[in-house]
Amino acid sequence: MLILTRRVGETLMIGDEVTVTVLGVKGNQVRIGVNAPKEVSVHREEIYQRIQAEKTQQTSY
């Protein structure tokens, strides 16, 4: 795992088309902004896991 340190307003690049920007830090929460092409899905981990579980349930019927 790559670990990076960024300050508010700083950005990191993932490939050529995805940017992640730190928008703010308040207590133990970090607000980030993600810019990605429409064909790239961006989800919080818990939402992604729910989507995958639903796909698995649909294919098992």
From Swiss-Prot:
It is found in: Cytoplasm. Disulfide bonds: none annotated. Coiled coil: none annotated. One of its GO terms (molecular function) is mRNA 5'-UTR binding. InterPro entries: CsrA, CsrA_sf. SUPFAM superfamilies: CsrA-like. Keywords: Activator, Cytoplasm, Repressor, RNA-binding, Translation regulation. One of its GO terms (cellular component) is cytosol. One of its GO terms (biological process) is regulation of carbohydrate metabolic process. Belongs to the CsrA/RsmA family. Homodimer; the beta-strands of each monomer intercalate to form a hydrophobic core, while the alpha-helices form wings that extend away from the core. PANTHER family: CARBON STORAGE REGULATOR (PTHR34984:SF1). A key translational regulator that binds mRNA to regulate translation initiation and/or mRNA stability. Mediates global changes in gene expression, shifting from rapid growth to stress survival by linking envelope stress, the stringent response and the catabolite repression systems. Usually binds in the 5'-UTR; binding at or near the Shine-Dalgarno sequence prevents ribosome-binding, repressing translation, binding elsewhere in the 5'-UTR can activate translation and/or stabilize the mRNA. Its function is antagonized by small RNA(s). This is Translational regulator CsrA. It comes from Erwinia tasmaniensis (strain DSM 17950 / CFBP 7177 / CIP 109463 / NCPPB 4357 / Et1/99). The lineage of its organism: Bacteria, Pseudomonadati, Pseudomonadota, Gammaproteobacteria, Enterobacterales.
